[in-house]
């Protein structure tokens, strides 16, 4: 826009400038040159500051992007770690459950075996007690039979045998008794 105004002014005063000493004698020319120099100077000075600010801002944005990328990578690594831990925990829980089931089955089998052994032991004890009771009953019956037989023999012999014969028969029966009881 300024160059259009300058061109228009130069065109207006162009005839005058040419007649009085040319382009270098025209104040508009020098104003335009001065203006361009100021703009160039400001551009050079401001360019470094603007570019520096833009570079700084770009570096800050890049740093933030790098940090965000690093945070994302860290978050993904952490997520992967927690997922791995969860899988490991699930495997461990499954292993614990399997072990508990195996242990329960083993304990149940042991309890059944112990119960069966206990039942067999009690049956054997009952059979032993019955056999012992039978043996005692048989021994009592034998003793009773012997006592009755001895008593009957004594009463029969007492009436029909002499005292010396009675004693001899009793001694013979007593000597014979151990062989007959077994």
From Swiss-Prot:
Superkingdom of source: Bacteria
Membrane topology: Single-pass membrane protein
Keyword Transport in annotation: yes
One cellular-component annotation, GO: plasma membrane-derived chromatophore membrane
Molecular function GO terms recorded: proton-transporting ATP synthase activity, rotational mechanism; proton-transporting ATPase activity, rotational mechanism
Pfam family, one: ATP-synt_B
Pro-sequence residue ranges: 1-7
Subcellular location: Cellular chromatophore membrane
Transmembrane segments: 24-44
Entry keyword annotation includes Membrane: yes
Cystine connections: none
Keywords associated with the record: ATP synthesis, CF(0), Hydrogen ion transport, Ion transport, Membrane, Transmembrane, Transmembrane helix, Transport
CDD domains from the UniProt entry: ATP-synt_Fo_b
Subunit and interaction comment: F-type ATPases have 2 components, F(1) - the catalytic core - and F(0) - the membrane proton channel. F(1) has five subunits: alpha(3), beta(3), gamma(1), delta(1), epsilon(1). F(0) has four main subunits: a(1), b(1), b'(1) and c(10-14). The alpha and beta chains form an alternating ring which encloses part of the gamma chain. F(1) is attached to F(0) by a central stalk formed by the gamma and epsilon chains, while a peripheral stalk is formed by the delta, b and b' chains.
Family to which the UniProt record says this protein belongs: Belongs to the ATPase B chain family.
Biological role: F(1)F(0) ATP synthase produces ATP from ADP in the presence of a proton or sodium gradient. F-type ATPases consist of two structural domains, F(1) containing the extramembraneous catalytic core and F(0) containing the membrane proton channel, linked together by a central stalk and a peripheral stalk. During catalysis, ATP synthesis in the catalytic domain of F(1) is coupled via a rotary mechanism of the central stalk subunits to proton translocation.
HAMAP family: ATP_synth_b_bprime
Protein's UniProt name: ATP synthase subunit b
UniProt source species: Rhodospirillum rubrum
UniProt gene name: atpF
């Amino acid at each position: 826009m300024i160059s259009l105004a300058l061109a228009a002014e130069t065109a207006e005063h162009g005839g005058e400038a040419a007649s009085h000493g040319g382009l270098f004698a025209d104040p508009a020319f020098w104003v335009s040159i001065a203006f361009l120099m100021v703009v160039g100077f400001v551009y050079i000075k401001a360019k470094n500051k603007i570019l520096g600010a833009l570079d700084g801002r770009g570096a800050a944005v890049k740093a933030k992007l790098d940090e965000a990328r690093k945070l994302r990578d860290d978050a993904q690594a952490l997520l992967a770690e927690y997922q791995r831990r969860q899988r490991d925990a699930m495997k461990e829980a499954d292993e614990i459950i399997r072990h508990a089931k195996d242990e329960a089955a083993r304990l149940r089998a042991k309890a059944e075996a112990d119960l069966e052994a206990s039942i067999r032991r009690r049956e054997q004890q009952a059979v032993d007690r019955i056999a012992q009771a039978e043996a005692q009953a048989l021994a009592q019956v034998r003793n009773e039979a012997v006592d009755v037989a001895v008593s009957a023999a004594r009463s029969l012999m007492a009436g029909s045998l002499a005292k010396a014969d009675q004693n001899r028969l009793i001694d013979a029966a007593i000597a014979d008794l151990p062989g007959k009881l077994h």
